[in-house]
């Protein structure tokens, strides 16, 4: 059963070594992520799943100890998904690498960890089904859900300006901040793809996991630096 969840954005710029001179701009987001991860620990889960978007070839499960690197962003920094050492496995996708960094930063040692890379093209029904399976995997399950909102909020955004982006992000933020499972499942997958909202599928995994759990939500951070929607929320 799902007992807690933290929702965090997943830009590598969250890592100060990657952001370099721009690092202070995301200090509020980092602080909110730290608070959200702390609430996960307070729920005393038996198992933690880190869920995030993944490109083709990086979908599926990642064991504790799986490694990720920020070398592709010009930084000699590696992280592992919790404790342990997974030899010879696939490297973590970027979203799970950022999640592993957040957990390491918080000193996570409260429950075994597994990672799950989600296909951006997964349907809402498939995502919800995955979430239900995760929630049923242990008596007390927690999720760290990585994902960004639209990437089309300004003309300088990665996806340029799309007038629909602000409304999409507002609804996503409202749903995440109120633990509105139905609203998350109702997010349009096609529109999310057009707006480059990589969080849609992971958020719908969360929605499936939270069905019937009776969790309350709280929005800890909302902003769109660089024209990309970033949200931090805590469910408990």
Predicted regions and their residues:
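A short aromatic-anchored loop/beta-hairpin motif
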Residues: 1-91
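Non-transmembrane, aqueous-exposed alpha-helical and coiled segments at domain scale
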Residues: 33, 50, 112, 132-135, ...
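Short, hydrophobic/amphipathic alpha-helical packing segments
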Residues: 29-41, 99, 124-131, 203
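Cap/lid and interdomain-hinge subdomains that line or gate substrate/regulatory clefts
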Residues: 81-129
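Metal-dependent phosphoesterases centered on the DNase I-like endonuclease/exonuclease/phosphatase
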Residues: 159-186
């Amino acid at each position: 059963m799902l007992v807690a969840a933290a929702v965090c954005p997943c830009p590598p710029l969250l890592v100060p070594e990657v952001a370099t001179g721009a690092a202070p701009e995301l200090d509020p987001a980092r602080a909110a992520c730290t608070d959200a991860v702390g609430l996960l620990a307070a729920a005393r889960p038996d198992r933690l799943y880190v869920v995030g978007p993944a490109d083709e070839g990086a979908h599926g499960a990642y064991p504790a100890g799986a490694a990720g690197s920020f070398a592709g962003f010009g930084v000699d920094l590696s992280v592992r998904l919790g404790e342990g050492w997974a030899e010879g496995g696939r490297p973590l996708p970027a979203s799970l690498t950022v999640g592993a960094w957040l957990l390491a930063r918080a000193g996570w040692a409260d429950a075994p960890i597994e990672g799950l890379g989600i296909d951006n093209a997964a349907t809402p029904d498939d995502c919800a089904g995955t979430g239900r399976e995760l929630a049923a995997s242990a008596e007390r399950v927690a999720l760290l859900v990585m994902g960004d909102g639209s990437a089309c909020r300004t003309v300088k955004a990665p996806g340029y300006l799309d007038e629909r982006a602000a409304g999409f992000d507002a609804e996503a933020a409202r749903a995440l901040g109120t633990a509105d499972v139905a609203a998350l499942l109702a997010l349009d997958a096609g529109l999310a793809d057009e707006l480059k909202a990589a969080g849609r599928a992971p958020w719908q995994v969360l929605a499936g996991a939270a069905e019937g759990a009776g969790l309350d939500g709280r929005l800890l951070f909302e902003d769109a630096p660089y024209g990309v929607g970033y949200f931090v929320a805590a469910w408990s």
